[in-house]
């Protein structure tokens, strides 16, 4: 009798544990971790809201492509400044290091020949073997890890990579420090040939700096009934800025120092990166998301962040206005100078006079006063890529809620803000301009945004 009572009590206890004290009520599925919005480093919070988009004043060019209308944009985060040379170098160096480590790992695998694998790491690696693919613990692996190892074979940085790269060992760039001839062979294949070197100084072959990434075409997927794999896009492109834009953009002009030093010299680290196409800017956004989420995964208890991306044209204009509706410029006033006669942005104020504002070319990304949202150089310095495709009629046919005319077939992309070589007209918050997606210029840069998840109340 006692055993029966004890068994019944055990059943009741097990039942109560399985029910999670729901008592049959609809309580919802709650996440284990509470979500809170974290402002990304180097960004400012834009509350979002409605504003009058377009040209409030008569357009002196008669373009008629930016009529006024009221639109609403969601809250988002935006880079405080344009992406700088220093920040873009972090992307370039990551791609460079990935390529070097991949080649070193293959060379280590080739050099090891028929040697028995050493998953436990009992034998101390030397030379090229220090850069071998990171070992997987096949003894203590989970059933899932074993299944993935036996059925998939992938090299890279994904969470399911079977042969991940070894990022722990330091790379040597000084040729005197190369550990062995296998290392020398790999590095030799990555540098320009000796007969192409200037004054015998060989540099890294920037043509090899290619970044591969995948993205999902939501726009096409929502409108066509194909298979999911049809909307997965594979992109491979070179990420190094086109430094020759300083020569190509200006005929019969001496700009050799900018061509040679602007991206390379530390004097320009805090200046906005230029020579980057729309396609390269999107690749940078993908890498920035990947880089942050890789860190989040390593910490395990942190959630993944929303993707970084280029701003839509509407988001860019809303941010540029800084909360001032009907303003002509980001600082609000109708003039490009202060009451003391000082220029408020970096642009070409007079025909032929590029340096009247104190700078011939670009200035540091943190220059002049920020606008009402705390954003620097939303007018002048460099024009900025947006995610939106250019269409002269987009203001007439676009939505009034987060408007964005996105057309993958249209290679013309909106650039905003004007630059150091532009007249004041292009600095106006309502002025529109465009450039081809695969074209880089010495006066076009970019900044990124990230979506704010949830509602940000005023």
Task: Indicate where each model-derived feature is located.
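Functional-site microenvironments in short loops/helix caps that host divalent-cation chemistry
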Residues: 21-25, 45-46, 52, 57, ...
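C-terminal motif of bacterial Sec signal peptides marking the signal peptidase cleavage site
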Residues: 15-16
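Non-catalytic, alpha-helical, charged scaffold/linker segments
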Residues: 103-224
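N-terminal pre-domain segments of enzymes
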Residues: 21-36
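Short capping motifs at secondary-structure boundaries
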Residues: 76, 83, 92-101, 288-298, ...
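Short, structured beta-strand segments at or near domain termini in extracellular proteins/domains
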Residues: 442-458
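Post-signal-peptide N-terminal segment of Sec-exported extracytoplasmic proteins
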Residues: 36-66
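Sec-dependent N-terminal signal peptides
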Residues: 5-12
């Amino acid at each position: 009798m006692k055993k029966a009572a004890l068994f019944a009590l055990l059943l009741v206890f097990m039942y109560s544990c399985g029910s999670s004290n729901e008592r049959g009520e609809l309580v919802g599925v709650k996440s284990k971790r509470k979500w809170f919005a974290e402002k990304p480093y180097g960004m400012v919070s834009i509350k979002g809201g409605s504003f009058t988009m377009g040209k409030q004043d008569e357009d002196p060019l008669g373009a008629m492509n930016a009529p006024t209308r009221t639109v609403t944009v969601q809250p988002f985060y935006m880079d405080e400044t344009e992406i700088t040379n220093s920040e873009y170098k972090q992307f370039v160096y990551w791609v460079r290091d990935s390529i070097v480590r991949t080649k070193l790992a293959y060379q280590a695998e080739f050099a090891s020949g028929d040697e028995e694998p050493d998953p436990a790491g009992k034998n101390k690696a030397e030379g090229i073997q220090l850069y071998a693919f990171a070992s997987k613990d096949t003894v203590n692996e989970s059933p899932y890890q074993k299944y993935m190892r036996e059925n998939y074979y992938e090299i890279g940085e994904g969470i399911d990579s079977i042969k991940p790269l070894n990022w722990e060992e330091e790379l040597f760039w000084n040729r005197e420090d190369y550990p062995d001839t296998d290392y020398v062979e790999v590095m030799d294949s990555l540098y320009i040939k000796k007969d192409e070197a200037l004054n015998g100084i060989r540099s890294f072959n920037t043509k090899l700096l290619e970044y591969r990434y995948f993205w999902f075409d939501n726009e096409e997927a929502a409108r066509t009934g194909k298979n999911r794999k049809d909307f997965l896009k594979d992109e491979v492109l070179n990420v190094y800025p086109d430094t020759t834009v300083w020569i190509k953009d200006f005929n019969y002009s001496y700009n050799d120092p900018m061509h040679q030093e602007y991206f390379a010299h530390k004097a320009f680290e805090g200046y906005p990166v230029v020579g980057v196409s729309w396609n390269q800017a999107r690749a940078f956004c993908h890498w920035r998301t990947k880089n942050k989420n890789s860190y989040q995964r390593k910490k395990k208890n942190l959630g993944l962040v929303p993707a970084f991306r280029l701003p839509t044209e509407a988001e860019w204009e809303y941010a540029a206005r800084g909360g001032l509706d009907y303003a002509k410029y980001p600082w609000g006033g109708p003039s490009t100078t202060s009451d003391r006669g000082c220029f408020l942005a970096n642009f070409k104020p007079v025909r032929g006079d590029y340096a009247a504002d104190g700078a011939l070319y670009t200035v540091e990304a943190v220059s002049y006063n920020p606008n009402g949202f705390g954003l620097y150089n939303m007018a002048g310095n460099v024009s900025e890529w947006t995610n939106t495709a250019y269409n002269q009629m987009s203001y007439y046919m676009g939505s009034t809620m987060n408007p964005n005319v996105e057309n993958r077939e249209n290679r013309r992309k909106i650039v905003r803000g004007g630059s150091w070589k532009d007249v004041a007209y292009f600095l106006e918050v309502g002025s529109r301009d465009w450039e081809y997606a695969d074209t880089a210029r010495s006066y076009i840069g970019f900044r990124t945004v990230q979506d704010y998840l949830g509602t940000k109340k005023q």
